[in-house]
Amino acid sequence: MVVDCHIHMALDGGYWKDALARHKEAPDEQFIRKTLETYKSLGFTYLRDGGDRWDAGKRASELAPEYGLCYRTPLFPIYRKGHYGSFIGRGFETLNDFRALVSEVKARGGHFIKIMISGLMDFNRYGVLTDEPMPGALIRELTNIAHGEGFSIMAHANGDAAVRGAILAGIDSVEHGAYLTDETLQMLAESKTVWVPTLVTIGNLIGDARFPEEATRPLLAYQMAAVRKAADFGALIAPGSDAGAYRVFHGQGGLDELALLRRALGDAADEILARGTAEIEARF
């Protein structure tokens, strides 16, 4: 039994614009079925999608029982207009806008809420993020709205400020979590927030000429050390690959992520990851 707590059915591990184009008229059911069959053949039992605004993840969730898979989706990620997330999500400007999107997720059968509260890791420049973090007060407002509607929350979050904001707001899981300090890792361990580090999004870039290894190698080393520290502190950690991201292929990406987490966590890896996975499955 294998799980992947962060995938994107709308993407395919190649160029994102080409991948999304196949779903823009309607979700590409042939692609979705082939991908679900891949997961089934590799022994996966649980998948959690990060969402897309073309309903590829939604269609996958409808088809997944045919393949013996539990598949959870937020329908689409929600981002603050003017900040990261426009390529795949739905945007809001006001809290009323956000409430309306949450209501839409509920009405259309989404399983949880996904929000974007930071930028990306800059894979060309070590130590750099591509956008400012969402203010902590706004993160709390969004969390209260979503929790008030009975939803758990998955948050794309990089950097200390965004992840601390997520922890303090009571967000259920944080994805990626680049460049966290020991203090933030300790906060994570003292909270109920689950960290899904998506190490393979970095690891699978090493050896690719697109990004300089003087950026990707130290970034992977930093993240693997942070995962080890977080586990030592007692944090909840779960495996998620961000499958569909560049060079993270469906199915194999989840196995690659598990291999990196086992390298980082050592002999206790499976026990540590089982704790985090149980929390994800229970809440999402």
What is each of the regions a protein language model found here?
Residues 2-63, 82-85:
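Metal-associated gating/positioning segment near the N- to mid-region
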Residues 8-12, 49, 53-57, 79-80, ...:
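Active-site environment of divalent metal-dependent phosphoester hydrolases
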Residues 10-27, 81-92, 124-132, 206-215:
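Acidic/histidine-rich helix-loop elements
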Residues 13-18, 163-169, 201-213, 223, ...:
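Histidine/acidic-residue-rich catalytic or RNA/ligand-binding cores of hydrolases
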Residues 29-58, 68-78, 110-124, 152, ...:
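Divalent metal-dependent hydrolysis catalytic cores, especially in the metallo-beta-lactamase
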Residues 30, 52, 90-100:
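Glycine-rich anion/phosphate-binding loops
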Residues 96-116, 121-195, 217-237, 271:
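Histidine/acidic residue-rich metal-binding segments in metalloenzymes
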Residues 148, 221-284:
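His/Asp/Glu-enriched, well-ordered alpha-helical/loop segment
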